[in-house]
Amino acid sequence: MGFSNNNSNKLIIISSQRKTIFDCEDGSITDIDAKFDEKELVAITDMLPDEYTPIAGAYGGQMTHKTLQGERVEISYHDKHIVSGKELQLQQIVFVDKFGAENIIYVNYPSYVCGFSSDGNCFALADDGGVYILRRINN
């Protein structure tokens, strides 16, 4: 998955089941025809013309963990567990605001990928349970 650089409220999500764009502004999900390159880690679709959208996930890549506003997420691992014969550690993700205040936003088995949109107004996380989106609401 990856956020559009030109349209930062649009998130491309590619799975074995389907390819979609999630609109972080209105919550709509649109099925798309997209092509992606697992080596270059980019996706293209006619829904986001003239753009190679960077993607990250099971094949590599990384979404940004910092915002232009000075916020960030910090990822750490704790408590080993054996699940289906594999040793896994719980992953904890902490959101740190620009003043240094910390809030735990995720504790679970490791996510596949997470990160902010280019404008820092959306945060997405994908794990075995699905895709989770947090959106900044300015009052």
Regions found by a protein language model. Give the residues of each.
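WD40-repeat beta-propeller superdomains and closely related acidic/aromatic-rich repeat-like regions
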Residues: 1-139
